Amino acid sequence: MSNNHYDVIIIGTGAGGGTLAHHLAPSGKKILVLERGSFLPREKANWDTVEVFQKDRYHTSEVWYDRDSEPIHPGTGYWVGGNTKVYGGALFRWRERDFEKVVHQGGVSPEWPLKYRDFEPYYTEAEKLYEVHGTRGEDVTEPYTNNPYPFAAITHEPRIQEIHEALENKGLHPFHLPLAIKLNEVNRRLSTCIRCDTCDGFPCLVDGKADADLNCMRPAADNWNNVSLLTEAQVLQRFSNE
C-alpha cells in the first residue's frame, strides 16, 4: 500500500480518463492514474478474425446483471486506452439537441445544465488531440463550429465513392466519417496507418489508431514526471473524508 500523496487520482485510462490525464499533465499537479487492465499486447492475433470476434480475445469474460438479474455480457475490454483500443476511430460531436430533454422509447433523457456551446471549444481541442480527419459542411446534421477538422477527410475506396456519388444524385447527403486514425494520404511512406481491412473491432497491430493509449496516456506518462500510471489496479471502492 502506497502512502504517497497525490493531488489528482484518475480512475481509468479510456477516452475520459486518458484525455483528462493528458490535459492535466502540464499543470504540475501530482497525478496518479489507476487502470485495472494492462497494455494490450501487439500480437498476430490482433488481426485474427476468429480470435477477435469468435473467441472474444480482447473482451472481458465477466458477466454483468441488469435490474431484473438477467445476465449481460458487456463486450468491453480492460486495457490502457480502454475501449478506444478496439474502436473504429469514428469521433462525432454531439448535436445541440442531445443536450436538451430527449424523449426515447424507453424513457426520458433529462436536459443538461450545460449546452453544446459550452463544450464546443473542447470538441475542437479533442479533434486536434485525436487527429480527426473529416470535411465540414458535408453532414447536414453537424453542430456549428468555425474550426475545420485538423486533417482532410479520408478518401473513399472506389466502390464507396461510387455509392457516395449515387446517393448525392438522389438528393441525399452522404458524408465522410470523422475518423481518428494516423493515416497520411499525402505521403504514405510516413503513414502509421496502412489502411487495412482490420480496423473497427480489432486492436491495431501497427498502432495506426489515434486512441487514448497512444495519443494521451503514453505521452502523459512518458513525458511528465508528475504523472504516474499504475496498471492492473482495480478500484473497488472510493473513500472520502467529506
Model feature map: region roles:
Residues 37, 180, 235:
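Residue-level "edge-of-site" marker
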Residues 12, 232-235:
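Glycine-rich anion-binding loop/nest that anchors nucleotide
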Residues 19-22, 215-218, 234-236:
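Generic recognition of flexible, low-complexity loop/linker segments
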Residues 103-232:
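Conserved redox-cofactor binding core of oxidoreductases
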Residues 237-242:
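Conserved beta-strand-loop-beta-strand element in the redox core of flavoprotein oxidoreductases
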Residues 1-125:
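N-terminal glycine-rich phosphate/pyrophosphate-binding loop and immediately adjacent elements
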